[in-house]
């Protein structure tokens, strides 16, 4: 977007503000002074490294007048963010997205801008344009980017009234921005823009002082996208990139990307026969092949035994449930866009459901409404209470009453409503609490096709789901137990580099359910348990769900990427919605507290992550093929088969390579197939009842009696030794699957 644009409208503000620095000291500044001015007063060196500022927890431009962001007492609690601050990198990348968009608009004609947010590892910008961009175009785009960076032009913020903002975007032929102003900003009265040279973009910011702060930038890939994620909307081109304050950091990050490609679970999964995605079955629906299924069974058996020993009760629930149950839980229609359409026992059910959805979106013309009424009558459905002149809510109510009298089902999007029904299936006493229910339950999400990614993002996923129903007094101990369980599970598979994110409520918000007393108790209990555990954790006020605080384990893999695994979530909402009760020791009825927890998250995503973490080379206890017996020749096949039988009876996953060829080739094939151990046998071993054991990692271990080999290998399995993953050195944790923020 290119234009001359007005400055921000003047606002009434005090002539001076008091700036409170992190050390508690106060500085008096003119209201039109900026954080950069404060930095310059301290030192020119500091000013050169200032990227943005943090004011009372909110990141703002370093060049924004302090009077605009002072509190009611004209005080500005200010923290300067420099290139060393982690949050400053996000600001840099946001500005890099603008610079990239500016470069693309210089090169190509007819470019309509969508959104350009940051992601966990970089940024992207979506474009609607006549020409197709490919990775072959990246060099010329990057060359133009470098010209913009070299010019060091400043970013400037200005604010317009909504009508003025719409006119500006209309004048610039930016129809997507016009649509967003008209439909995407609610009742927002003003709109902020940023200008850099000839480029102007609607944006909430913040941005770096000038483009010259971008010391390293790289375009990474191009993909398809939809306007606002709506598959029925306009198709866009999405260009991804990343940026850093230092060229060495970029080089390290690019090496991390290359290493991630070498470990791609989709490639390794196909190469080693672990899983498959078949379009005839459906995108996002995993077929677990025998080797992958063995890994899954091992994980399930491991966790099942552990849960049973910790007082959990197994349950099973169906793959579908009545829509009314999900209306009670709130999952429907709130999460409808990410769910498969309801299943109906009547042919006309789908018609009425689509009809209701159109009314809900206020997207039904009079002609279409008449056609729907006629179509329903064709199926024998008459709706005498349906009045076209009534409000949409009244019309939806008529349709809903018809639906209530006919069976409607959903593919299960969550296990928790089913578990609530299991709790409520019989009277409960405080003596039965805590009640811990667990299930490896498969749920279904209608993810967009473009978001699907092997096992990492799927439409059918099996969660290691458990729900604990307890009293308020039991929350602390149950939380401690779930934290210990999650630690145990993660460390058992070699994931010992993690931190915990504790999501708390916003004390200034009233959106939360449950009493303030319960929230205070729960948050204090969670914080206390984490402090006592010695775990590294950070608190995130305002990040709690409306129904309770939670703790997420953020696990770093061997190449430095961070994965959200292992969630513990308190819930005051579902027990209330389902009217769950237990009789207390006071003989009165009470609501239980519900705790959701899943150490794996989903077996698909967890297994996919392990494939990449171990580069397909699973530790012995998880491996789908632990031992391969290699006979030296046909004469030794009979003995090899006998050895394999003994190993199988000892509980190992074992195969025999009875193919023709030299043993060196068989060893090489076993190494390629990532088999943990090879047992080489020939006439000498047959005569002495031994095997020549070979470790995939350490090589030849020499000959030994079969019983000795079995004892050695059993110890490795029983202790769940992990020797495969090699820690990598990376510049930062790149979060996987971070949510982008529009506008």
UniProtKB/Swiss-Prot annotation:
Zn(2+) binds at residues 416, 467, 596. Residues 264-619 are annotated as: Catalytic. GO terms for molecular function: ATP binding; metal ion binding; threonine-tRNA ligase activity; tRNA binding. Keywords: Aminoacyl-tRNA synthetase, ATP-binding, Cytoplasm, Ligase, Metal-binding, Nucleotide-binding, Protein biosynthesis, RNA-binding, tRNA-binding, Zinc. SMART domains: tRNA_SAD. Residues 13-76 form the TGS domain. Disulfide bonds: none annotated. Its main location: cytoplasm. Its cofactor is Zn(2+). Its EC number is 6.1.1.3. It is found in: Cytoplasm. Homodimer. PANTHER family: THREONINE--TRNA LIGASE, CHLOROPLASTIC_MITOCHONDRIAL 2, THREONINE-TRNA LIGASE. Belongs to the class-II aminoacyl-tRNA synthetase family. This is Threonine--tRNA ligase.
């Amino acid at each position: 977007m290119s234009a001359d644009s007005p400055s921000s409208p003047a606002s009434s503000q005090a002539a001076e503000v008091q700036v409170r620095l992190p050390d508690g000291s106060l500085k008096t500044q003119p209201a039109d002074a900026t954080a950069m001015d404060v930095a310059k007063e301290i030192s020119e060196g500091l000013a050169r490294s200032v990227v943005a500022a943090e004011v009372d927890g909110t990141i703002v431009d370093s060049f924004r007048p302090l009077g605009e962001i002072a509190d009611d007492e004209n005080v500005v609690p200010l923290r300067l963010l420099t290139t060393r601050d982690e949050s400053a990198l996000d600001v840099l990348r946001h500005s890099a997205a603008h610079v990239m968009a500016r470069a693309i608009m210089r090169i190509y004609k007819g470019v309509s801008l969508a959104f350009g947010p940051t992601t966990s590892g970089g940024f992207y910008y979506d474009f609607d344009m006549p020409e197709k961009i490919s990775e072959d175009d990246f060099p010329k785009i990057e060359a133009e980017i470098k010209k913009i960076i070299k010019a060091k032009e400043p970013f400037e913020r200005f604010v317009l009234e909504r009508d003025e903002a719409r006119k500006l975007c209309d004048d610039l032929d930016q129809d997507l921005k016009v649509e967003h102003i008209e439909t995407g900003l609610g009742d927002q009265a003003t709109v902020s823009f940023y200008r850099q040279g000839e480029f102007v973009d609607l944006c909430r910011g913040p941005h770096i002082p000038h483009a010259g702060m971008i010391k390293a930038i790289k375009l990474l890939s191009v993909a398809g996208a939809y306007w606002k994620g709506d598959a029925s909307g306009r198709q866009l081109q999405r260009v991804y990139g990343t940026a850093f304050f230092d060229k060495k950091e970029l080089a390290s990050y690019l090496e991390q990307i290359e290493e991630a490609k070498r470990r791609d679970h989709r490639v390794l999964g196909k190469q080693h026969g672990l899983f498959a995605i078949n379009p005839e079955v459906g995108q996002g629906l995993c077929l677990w092949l025998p080797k992958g299924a063995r890994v899954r069974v091992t994980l399930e058996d491991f966790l099942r035994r552990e849960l049973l020993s910790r007082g959990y009760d197994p349950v099973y629930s169906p793959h579908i449930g009545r829509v009314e149950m999900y209306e009670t839980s709130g999952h429907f229609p709130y999460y409808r866009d990410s769910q498969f359409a309801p299943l109906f026992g009547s042919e006309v059910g789908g018609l009425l459901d689509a009809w209701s959805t159109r009314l809900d979106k206020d997207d039904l013309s009079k002609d279409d409404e008449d056609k729907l009424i006629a179509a329903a009558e064709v199926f024998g459905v008459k709706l005498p209470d349906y009045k076209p002149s009534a409000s949409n809510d009244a019309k939806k109510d008529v349709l809903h009453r018809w639906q209530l009298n006919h069976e409607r089902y959903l593919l299960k999007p969550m296990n928790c409503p089913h578990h609530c029904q299991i709790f409520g299936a019989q009277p409960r006493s405080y003596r039965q609490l805590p009640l811990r229910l667990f299930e490896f339950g498969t749920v279904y999400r209608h993810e967009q096709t473009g978001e699907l990614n092997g096992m990492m993002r799927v439409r059918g996923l099996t969660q290691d789901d458990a729900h604990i129903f307890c009293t308020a007094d039991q929350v602390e101990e149950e939380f401690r137990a779930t934290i210990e369980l999650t630690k145990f599970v993660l460390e058992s598979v070699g994931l010992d580099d993690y931190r915990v994110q504790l999501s708390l409520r916003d004390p200034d918000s009233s959106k939360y359910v449950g009493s303030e007393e319960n929230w205070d108790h729960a948050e204090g209990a969670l914080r206390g348990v984490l402090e006592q555990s010695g775990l590294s954790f950070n608190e995130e006020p305002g990040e709690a769900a409306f129904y309770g605080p939670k703790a997420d384990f953020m696990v770093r893999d061997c190449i430095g990427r961070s994965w959200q695994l292992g969630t513990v979530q308190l819930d005051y909402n579902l027990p209330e919605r389902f009217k769950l009760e237990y009789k207390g020791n006071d003989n009165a009825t009470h609501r239980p507290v519900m705790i959701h927890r899943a150490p794996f998250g989903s077996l698909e995503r967890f297994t996919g992550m392990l494939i990449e973490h171990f580069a397909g080379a699973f530790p012995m206890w998880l491996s789908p093929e632990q031992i391969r017996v290699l006979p030296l020749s046909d004469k030794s096949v009979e003995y090899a088969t006998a050895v394999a039988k003994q190993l199988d009876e000892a509980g190992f996953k074992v195969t025999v390579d009875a193919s023709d060829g030299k043993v060196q080739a068989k060893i090489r094939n076993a190494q390629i197939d990532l088999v943990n151990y090879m047992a080489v046998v020939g006439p000498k071993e047959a005569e002495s009842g031994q095997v020549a054991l070979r470790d995939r990692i350490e090589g030849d271990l020499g000959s030994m009696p079969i019983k000795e080999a079995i004892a050695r290998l059993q110890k490795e399995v029983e202790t769940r030794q992990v020797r495969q993953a090699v820690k990598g050195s990376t510049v930062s944790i790149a979060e996987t699957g971070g949510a982008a923020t529009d506008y």
